[in-house]
């Protein structure tokens, strides 16, 4: 899987002379953004304990928000790197599909981004991860306003910020009696997933599940 990821990055024309995580030299063009030592750390690391998330029946996490995985997520988001987002999706694909087969959701979706973020990046990174994983999804959410990034916000500030997540009016009828899986990149305080789950349940969804690429420590 690691070699596949490296080849995908190279195939996309994305290759640097130094590893963007540790700065070590990259000797092979197949390595793309990361040295071999760092790529070896790109493996699932499920938390030993899952804290309860309000309105969410169950959820899964691929790994910890640290090291190479954290760098990959940040690079995909803030380097506006759609190919890297899709490549990361391919890495997590087997684990995401395993969970999908277990819960058998009727509908899979992910958070929306506001217009400011969309125009600065040119894409929604979680949508591109799902495309990379080969997972069909429906755009259920939108985000209003021009708020900045949520990283570094306090819990109270996050609770206010997540109010900008709304449902798309045209899909509300699709949610009634549906089992919904929400995919997101990082689980931190749980404010975002709680808001999204509450929204879909409020219009008749039967159950909400979640999958996160990483969980913050």
Predicted regions and their residues:
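Glycine-rich phosphate/pyrophosphate-handling loop used in enzymes and phosphotransfer proteins
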Residues: 1-217
């Amino acid at each position: 899987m690691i070699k596949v990821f490296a080849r995908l990055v190279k195939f996309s024309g994305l290759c640097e002379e130094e590893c963007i995580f540790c700065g070590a030299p990259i000797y092979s063009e197949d390595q793309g953004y990361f040295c071999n030592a760092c790529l070896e750390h790109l493996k699932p690391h499920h938390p030993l304990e899952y804290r309860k998330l309000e309105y969410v029946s169950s959820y899964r996490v691929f790994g910890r928000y640290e090291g190479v995985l954290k760098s990959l997520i940040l690079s995909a988001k803030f380097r506006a790197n759609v190919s890297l987002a899709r490549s990361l999706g391919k890495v997590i694909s087997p684990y995401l599909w395993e969970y999908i087969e277990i819960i058998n959701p009727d509908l899979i979706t992910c958070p929306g981004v506001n217009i400011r973020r969309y125009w600065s990046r040119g894409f929604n990174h979680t949508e591109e991860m799902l495309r990379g994983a080969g997972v069909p999804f429906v755009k259920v959410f939108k985000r209003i306003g021009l708020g900045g990034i949520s990283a570094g916000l306090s819990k109270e500030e996050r609770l206010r910020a997540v109010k900008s997540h709304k449902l798309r009016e045209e899909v509300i009828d699709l949610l009634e009696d549906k089992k919904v899986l929400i995919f997101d990149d990082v689980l931190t305080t749980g404010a975002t997933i709680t808001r999204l789950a509450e929204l879909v349940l409020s219009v008749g969804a039967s159950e909400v599940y979640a999958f996160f690429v990483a969980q913050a420590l």
